[in-house]
Structure formats: structure tokens, C-alpha cells
Amino acid sequence: MSYSQQVNKRRTFAIISHPDAGKTTITEKVLLYGNAIQKAGSVKGKGSQAHAKSDWMEMEKQRGISITTSVMQFPYHDCLVNLLDTPGHEDFSEDTYRTLTAVDSCLMVIDSAKGVEERTIKLMEVTRLRDTPILTFMNKLDRDIRDPMELLDEVESVLKIRCAPITWPIGCGKLFKGVYHLYKDETYLYQSGQGHTIQDVRIIKGLNNVDLDRAVGEDLARQLRDELELVKGASNEFDHDLFIRGELTPVFFGTALGNFGVDHFLDGLTQWAPAPQARQADCRLVESAEEKLTGFVFKIQANMDPKHRDRVAFMRIVSGKYEKGMKLKQVRLGKEVVLSDALTFMAGDRSHAEEAYAGDIIGLHNHGTIQIGDTFTQGEDLKFTGIPNFAPELFRRIRLKDPLKQKQLLKGLVQLSEEGAVQVFRPLTNNDLIVGAVGVLQFDVVVSRLKSEYNVEAVYETVNVAAARWVECSEAKKLEEFKRKNEQNLALDGGDSLTYIAPTMVNLNLTQERYPDIQFFKTREH
């Protein structure tokens, strides 16, 4: 197979949803269809049952939430699909945000009983920054749901994206009978209790087929025909160009738990979603068709293998082909590295990659030299842009139960901050360690991982910090004066960047007014 054929058969996507909309269940079922697992695990991991394959960190298993982004690759039809699983819990915006910079399309999962929820709105704002194409799955049809037309209207008005229904539900809850495919003129009948394995679904051709009335009952069949009249008149036709521009989303209905409808959106994904796209670097646009390898690191994860103290950097390949043993330039450090043991993923199971192409995600072993945002090339000096770091909104001081373990604590915190799990600030005037996060759950994650991975017991104390801003100034003299006068409020972050730590928002505003030549940044490029 030629290089361009290899690239064109790849689809790299992420699933976005509000917590509890059924994302982990969908991930499981997608893997089931991709033959990546034989039987879907029970998602919340109750006692002896199988844990969901994509939730493999200790704390995730206990809480039933996906905390870190795993990567799973599987074949489907003629395509090779890379699924990046994003944390579903509302606390995890940074990791999720960066993951969305590494995909070419997204599947939005909506709980049909609840409609569009707050977390979905936030994630959609992120996908808007790059006009990522979106497919939509209306989930939980085996429960009582809101009116399907109402759901489409809500998506259109709240998320500002046009909807084109591809399938349409027949009943819901206990009366859920299946879906009708608007473009194939076929009805797929639902059987309950078949969630763990793939079933043969009965298909009825034609909307006016009498078999349809027999299968779903005359009332539901009549209701379906009436609704479809309305749908065809009131909703948008699917338009591929609008979809690629992120202006229109194809909508599928089903139930992930009942394993029904999942294959319909997978068909849509492989048929319509874009193959790996070009990406902007600081000096030029890099096309996926280029044969020289380029890629960027969007995430670092510690200890994917509890047996080894390792860290893995996740790299999205933008162009070219990875081959075992090849030499690459790590642009930030200006040094050559030999990649002999990159990994491919099936969540938690790792296998060594012999080759990988544009669109694929590979794992690089990292002994502290790779950071989020690093670019790797075959010699060219370029840096991919658009991988952000956010100023945290919540702060705690972290204190050791055993003061002799200061060194391990610092090492653990710096590693966790490079991974993007949390941010660490070391004030210039004392030995405190201040931890900053975007959401409360991150604090729990850090303490639990310090204990299980670094054998360090730590506790939090409140700290008088309301905001952190990265500071820069083009004139060294003015920066020195600023440092001298504000030393009490300055710290270094995990990457040794100078940060202003404000006790109150009023203080921050006053300081910004007092020093107009100093720039205060809320986000910064990695």
C-alpha cells in the first residue's frame, strides 16, 4: 500500500460529552465493533466484573470516571481508526482541551433525556477554534427521552451548528423499536438485552413496507411516517462540505448500553470524516501528504505501566512515516534522538510500533526530557502551534507528612506538571510548594498519585492565592525592577517560567495597571 493510501485510510477522532452521557459505554462498543475487545466490560467496574478497557488508572477504576486520555487504534471496514478517549469529568478541561488539538473530527454524545449540557457547550467551543467536523450521537433511546425534534432544535440554537438527521428513532424507553435510516430507506429493529456482543439486526427495506407495521405495531409505524414528513420538511439535508467546515453535524440515534446504532455513526465516520489534515507550524503549513516525519506531543502520562516507573509522551504524527530506529530532531532542545521503541496503544495494553503514519498517535518513552508541545522532525526547524497551557483557577499549598521526603515530592510534582495533570509554583522568597489546578478533582488525583507512584504522603493547606499569570517583558531592565519590587508575589512554574501569584483579583488588576510594560498572560503556548 502506498504512503498516500495509508494516510487516507486513517481517521483520528475524540468523543466529547457531558459526564454521564454514556461516553465510556460508547467507547467500549466502538472497540467491540473494531474487534478490539471480544466482550464489552461493565463500565463502572462493580466488584468482580470486567473494568471498562479505556479506564485503566487506579483512581478511575474506583470512581468510574475516565481521568486521562487513552488512545485506542482499531480497524473498521477499510479504515484504521484512532480513538482518543477524553476525560469525561468536568474537572479535566486542560487534558481534554489539548487532546482536541490532536484529532481531525469529534463525536458528540448527548443524553437524549437531558439534551445539551454545560460541559458539552464548553467542549464545542474548543472544537470551534479549529472548525473540527462533528458527528452527533443521541444516546439512551432505551430510556424515556425528550422529543427528538426538540433535541435537534436545542443543538442548533445552543451550539450554533446545523443538524442533519441520518437516522430517526421509532419510539423510546420500553417502546423503543429501532431506527429508520433516512438515506438508505431501511429500518433497523432493536432487541433489548443484547448489549455485550454484536448482534445480527433485522433490517426492513422501505418505509411503506407492511413488514414494518407488523414489526413495530401500526401506531408506531404511522407515527414514524408522520414524523419523517415533518423531518424532511423542517431539517437540513446532509451536506459534506458544510460538515467538513464544522457548520453541520450528521445526527444518529441509538443506545450505547443496548449496543444499538453505534455502527451507524462508525459508518458515517469512516465515510465522511476527514483523513489526517494539514497543520499550522510557526513558519509554514505542514501537509499530511509530505513524506518527511513531523509530529507534536500533546500529552504526557506517567506510569502507564505500574511495574515500571515510566512516562510516555503521546505524539500525533502530522506528516510522514515512523519506522523503528529512525533518527528525529527534538526541535526545542536542538538534539537528535533515536526512536527505537515507540508504542502503539490499545488502552493500557502497549505494543511496540514497527511503523506508523500521519494521523496515528505513538508513545515515546520519556525520561524527563520531553515536554507537552514539543515538536519532532527529520531535521527541519519548525514548531507546531496551538497547544495551550491555561492559568489555573484553584490553588493549594502542599505539605509533606514526612519532611525528609522533600526531594521525592518535588520530583513527583514536576513530573505531574509536565504531564499536564497539575501546575506547580515555587515562590521565590520561601520553600513553599503551591499547586494550581483547573478543577478540584485534580487535587485529589495528585495526592493519590504521589502516594501510589512516588511513595509520598502529602496534605493540602489553604493558601492566599487568587490567580496566577505568566509574566514577560521585552526590556530586561524593566523586568528586573518589576522582580525586585514584587518578589513576594513571584514564583517559578514547573518549567521555570516566571509567574505572578496574586493574593486577590484586585491586587492583580492594580499590579497590571502599575506596570504597563509588563505583559501578564492567562494562557501560554507549551
From Swiss-Prot:
Give all residue intervals belonging to the tr-type G domain: 8-277
Provide a GO biological process annotation. regulation of translational termination
Q: Where in the cell is it found?
A: Cytoplasm
- Can the keyword Plastid be found in this entry's annotation? no
Q: Does the keyword Protein biosynthesis apply?
A: yes
UniProt binding sites for GTP: 17-24, 85-89, 139-142
Q: Name the predominant localization.
A: cytoplasm
Keywords on record? Cytoplasm, GTP-binding, Nucleotide-binding, Protein biosynthesis
Protein family per UniProt: Belongs to the TRAFAC class translation factor GTPase superfamily. Classic translation factor GTPase family. PrfC subfamily.
Designated name of the protein: Peptide chain release factor 3
Species annotation: Histophilus somni (strain 129Pt) (Haemophilus somnus)
